[in-house]
């Protein structure tokens, strides 16, 4: 099972981690210089939860946003257990 929200489709993002040195121009410096860029993974806020869909019980990954939606009541035939 991939780490992707069953309801919203949210998943991990690959982003750049930018390392800088120096003092900003606004603070009286000559500006910030980029000294390194590396890729990193920004993880989605996912939780493994049991749901009931069409009478069947499934264990799926759900985002925090989807959990808030489901806590208000059934949504598209899906409910939390």
UniProtKB/Swiss-Prot annotation:
Keyword Ribonucleoprotein in annotation: yes
Pfam families, sorted: Ribosomal_L28
Top-level taxon in the UniProt lineage: Bacteria
GO biological process, one term: translation
SUPFAM superfamilies: L28p-like (SSF143800)
Key words of the record: Ribonucleoprotein, Ribosomal protein
Protein's UniProt keywords contain Protease: no
An MF annotation (GO) of this entry: structural constituent of ribosome
GO cellular component terms given for this protein: ribonucleoprotein complex; ribosome
PANTHER family assigned: 50S RIBOSOMAL PROTEIN L28 (PTHR39080), LARGE RIBOSOMAL SUBUNIT PROTEIN BL28A (PTHR39080:SF1)
Family label: Belongs to the bacterial ribosomal protein bL28 family.
Self-association state and partner proteins as the record states: Part of the 50S ribosomal subunit.
HAMAP family named in the record: Ribosomal_bL28 (MF_00373)
Protein name: Large ribosomal subunit protein bL28
Name of the gene encoding the protein in the UniProt record: rpmB
